[in-house]
Regions:
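Short S/T/G/P-rich N-terminal loop/turn motif that feeds into the first structured element of a domain
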Residues: 23-260
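Bacterial N-terminal signal peptides that target proteins for export
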Residues: 1-11
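Bacterial N-terminal signal peptides
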Residues: 10-19
């Protein structure tokens, strides 16, 4: 039954991902064709005792050099929670989360090299000495993008909002297309919007897919909140009443560490 449920989720969500929403004149963003779904790896990491972030980052820099040499380097970002859902009773078990975005074939090649080449295995061993990281894989697609802002801004803010659909993919896709048209006309501070659908290792996520919204600064984030407070909440309420149940947004600080 669980396998059938997972298969249904894939059949419903993937058409949403493959709908044409983004970048009408140029579908390339950070070296990837974001008109199509791409792979997004999440590393949820906690540093080992005595290891500093500087120690860990030195390994990441060596990894990126290795990945560039082997022509498998991803878009690489790191996020820290700013406004999270966690409490003293439910603390976040990680120090940070990293996201590595790449097309599927390139990422498969990267993992083959990581697991079988001498240099890849050495880096993997070093990685595991520095931190414990739970690794997850997901489908993702950008639905709205201010390309210039996204490719030039290395320090930004990202909200995550996990949702579970109430309707079929046609209705959800149409609603997302309507939302993209509204963003294109008036982004109210947002420079990017994407959806993420886990495909491997993420059975315990808080929803079946996530909305990601990207902001260049906190002023832009609060501009969006003002828009919601002055009437935009009606659209959010309609979405959650009729299209999907969502957990609510969490805001993370994001640093872009590498672009291919």
């Amino acid at each position: 039954m669980q396998c059938l449920k997972s298969a249904w989720r894939v059949m419903m969500i993937l058409p949403i991902l493959t709908s044409s929403f983004v970048l009408a004149d140029d579908h390339m963003l950070n070296g990837m064709n974001v008109q199509q779904p791409f792979n997004l790896q999440a590393n949820l990491c906690k540093l080992n005792p005595g290891v500093s972030l500087e120690d860990y980052h030195a390994m990441v820099e060596d990894y990126l050099a290795w990945a560039e040499t082997n022509d498998v380097d991803p878009v690489f970002v790191r996020q820290f929670p700013l406004f999270s859902h966690q409490t003293l009773q439910r603390p976040w078990p990680y120090d940070f989360v990293e996201f590595l975005a790449s097309d599927y074939e390139r990422w498969g090649k990267s993992w083959d090299l990581w697991l079988t080449s001498k240099s890849g295995m050495a880096l993997n061993e070093r990685w595991q000495e520095l931190a414990v990281c739970d690794v997850k894989q997901a489908h993702s697609q950008v639905l709205y993008a201010n390309r210039e802002a996204l490719e030039s801004d290395d320090e930004r803010y990202v909200t995550w909002n996990w949702c579970t659909p109430k309707v079929g993919f046609e209705q959800l896709s149409q609603k997302h297309a309507q939302y993209v048209a509204e963003l294109t006309n008036n982004p109210t501070g947002m420079i990017g919007w994407a959806v993420v659908f886990p495909h491997t290792g993420a059975a315990n996520m808080p929803g079946e897919f996530a909305h990601l919204a990207v902001y260049p600064d906190m002023e832009s984030f609060m501009t969006r909140r003002k828009s919601e407070a002055t009437g935009g909440w009606r659209g959010q309420r309609e979405y959650e009443q009729n299209y999907a149940d969502c957990t609510g947004e969490q805001l993370n600080i994001e640093t872009v560490l590498h672009r291919p």
